[in-house]
C-alpha cells in the first residue's frame, strides 16, 4: 500500500559519485594572452629551423678568425662581386629587416640559383661577426682562398695580348694593404699578385672587403721562396722592378711598356736584401712635400698608374 511500503530503494555505493570538476581557473588562458603573433620558424629557439640558424651563426662567428679556415666576406659590394664571379660559398647571411636594394636582391637571387643556403639572422649576430659593424646587413661564408701557382700566374699573363703586368709583395703584413693592391692591379690591367707563403698578409675577409671584390677576378699566387720565383720570372723575360723609398731612380724613368713585375716593399721595412739584389732596378716615387714615404698600397697604385699611362702612349 502506498506510503506503507517497507521496500528499501536503490542505494548508491559509497565513493562512486563524481565530485565537482576542478578547472584551471583561467591560468592557461591568461598565460596565452599578450604573446602576439607566432614568430617565424628560424626565430623560434626550439624549432629545427631556429636551431639550424643559431648553429650557422655561431659557426660563422668563430670561423672568420682563422686564416686557414672558412672566411666571411662582409658588405654588399664584396658579397655581390664574389657571387657574380662564381666564388664557392656555403652560406649567405641576411640581417632581419635589412634595407633592400639592387645589390642585396641580386645577391639573394644568385645564391638561390646556385643552391647556396640563405639564412636570415638577427642583426646582432652579424655585428658579432663583423667587429667593426660594417656588414651592411649581409655576409657570405666562403671556403679558404684558392691560391694560384706562380707558374700559372705567369702563363696566364703571357697568354694575354697585353704585356705581362704582375705585382709581388715583400714584407706586406697588413691584409688591408694586400686588398687595396689587388684592387689597383685589377683597375690598371694587371694580371695578378704574388705573395710569400710565410710572413705575409693572406687573402682574408679583411683583404676581400678592401679589394671591393677584386680578389674574385684577380688571381693571387703564393710562393714558397719569393726570391726564387722572381728569378724564374726574370729568366722568362720579365723586368723585375723594386719599389722602395731609397730607390736608385724614379718611377717615371722606367720602361713599363714591356713585360714587368713590380715588387712592393713595406712602408717600414722596405725590400728585403735578397729581393733587392735580384731586381733589375729599384725605383722611388718623387714627392714635392716633406712626406718621407707613402703607404705601400698607395705607392703601388702610383706605379701601376704610371705603367698604364706609358702603355696607352706606346
From Swiss-Prot:
Residues that hold S-adenosyl-L-methionine according to the record: 265, 285, 294
Region annotation (Disordered) ranges: 1-70
Keyword Transmembrane: no
UniProt signal peptide: none
Keywords for this protein: Methyltransferase, S-adenosyl-L-methionine, Transferase
Classification via PANTHER family: 23S RRNA (GUANOSINE-2'-O-)-METHYLTRANSFERASE RLMB
Protein name: Uncharacterized tRNA/rRNA methyltransferase Mvan_5337
Protein source organism: Mycolicibacterium vanbaalenii (strain DSM 7251 / JCM 13017 / BCRC 16820 / KCTC 9966 / NRRL B-24157 / PYR-1) (Mycobacterium vanbaalenii)
